[in-house]
């Protein structure tokens, strides 16, 4: 009897040991810049893959994010966007510790959206089933893109970008059953005219709905963008970049807001965002301007990145922040460097 009991106990040991050993389940991570168009695209990928999104400043390498990614124990990191948006330092650092990295990007936000949509359309088909709503936003209308981030939560919103005439991917070319096309309309967007696009979609027999963002919400979003731009300009200033013209333009936006001239304020804000991105390229990617002019060829062995340790700077700049919108987006892994609404 004792021998039988000992045998049973010995047989149970492996089973008990297997249960007692803790394990952390790995997941995929989606790494994206704080470019609104890329963020929308990243969120829908994360929703379909049940992945975690981590956001980095556009064009800037933040070494502390590598530690945050490693803490999630990912099997794979999917980078959304080109190497100017999410710099190659991330790829190198992650691959050096044995993590598989897949980058899906393009020469601009429209190509990135198209390439990601086509790459993951099988996953989208599984996630959406027979009830896919295509959410259409202008690629440079950050307010509409932020509104769309909230719509992604329901799991049936596929984001396609438009320049007002064409879409990043034509819906009929996708292997998805599209229920309707929802155009996200920002009432103060001065360059968003969807009339030609609507005619084209109607000719293809698609059901179209216009979802206009309430003006009260638009005003709050624009105010939040001003706060974010203040932070970005200050970051560049601390890096030694001359930002006098950016500060003057931001002041003009604030004055227009005080006069309730929201459309003009938004037009200048969009210009300001583009100028700020160019300033990042010129300061942190010194080879970019030369390659742009075609004076040199890309050296494949060069890192192309001006290494900038921004950990202390971002901590200082983020001591007090508030915001709406993006903070409630699904799967967002919030860290100090993130902007609450992009």
Curated annotation (Swiss-Prot):
Residues 1-18 form the signal peptide. Keywords: Signal. InterPro entries: Bact_Sporulation_Assoc. It comes from the Archaea. The keyword Signal applies. PANTHER family: N-ACETYLMURAMOYL-L-ALANINE AMIDASE LYTC, N-ACETYLMURAMOYL-L-ALANINE AMIDASE-RELATED. This is Uncharacterized protein MJ0755. It comes from Methanocaldococcus jannaschii (strain ATCC 43067 / DSM 2661 / JAL-1 / JCM 10045 / NBRC 100440) (Methanococcus jannaschii).
């Amino acid at each position: 009897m004792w021998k039988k009991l000992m045998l049973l106990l010995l047989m149970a040991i492996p089973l008990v040991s297997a249960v007692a050993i803790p394990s952390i389940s790995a997941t995929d991570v989606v790494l994206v810049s704080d470019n609104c168009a890329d963020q929308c695209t990243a969120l829908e990928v994360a929703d379909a893959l049940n992945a975690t999104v981590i956001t980095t400043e556009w064009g800037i390498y933040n070494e502390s994010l590598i530690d945050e990614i490693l803490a999630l124990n990912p099997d794979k990191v999917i980078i959304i966007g080109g190497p100017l948006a999410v710099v190659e330092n991330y790829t190198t650092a992650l691959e050096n510790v044995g993590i598989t990295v897949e980058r899906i990007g393009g020469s601009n936000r429209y190509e990135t959206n198209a390439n990601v949509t086509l790459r993951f359309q099988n996953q989208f088909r599984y996630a959406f089933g027979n009830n896919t709503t295509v959410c259409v936003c202008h690629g440079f209308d950050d307010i509409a893109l932020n509104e769309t981030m909230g719509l992604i939560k329901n799991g049936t919103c596929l984001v396609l970008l438009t320049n007002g005439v064409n879409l990043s991917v034509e819906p009929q070319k996708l292997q998805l059953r599209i229920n309707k096309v929802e155009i996200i309309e920002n009432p103060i967007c001065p360059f968003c005219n969807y009339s030609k696009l609507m005619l084209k979609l109607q000719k293809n027999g698609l059901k179209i709905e216009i979802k206009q963002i309430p003006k009260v919400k638009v005003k709050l979003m624009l105010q939040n963008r001003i706060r974010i731009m203040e932070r970005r300009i200050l970051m560049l200033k601390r890096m030694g970049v001359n930002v006098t013209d950016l500060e003057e333009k931001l002041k003009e936006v604030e004055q227009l807001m005080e006069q309730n001239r929201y459309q003009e304020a938004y037009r200048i804000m969009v210009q300001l965002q583009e100028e700020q991105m160019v300033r990042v390229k010129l300061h942190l990617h010194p080879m970019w301007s030369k390659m742009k002019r075609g004076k040199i060829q890309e050296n494949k062995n060069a890192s192309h990145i001006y290494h900038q340790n921004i950990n202390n700077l971002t901590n200082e700049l983020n001591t007090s922040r508030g915001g709406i919108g993006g903070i409630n987006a699904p799967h967002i892994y919030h860290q100090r460097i993130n902007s609450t609404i992009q």
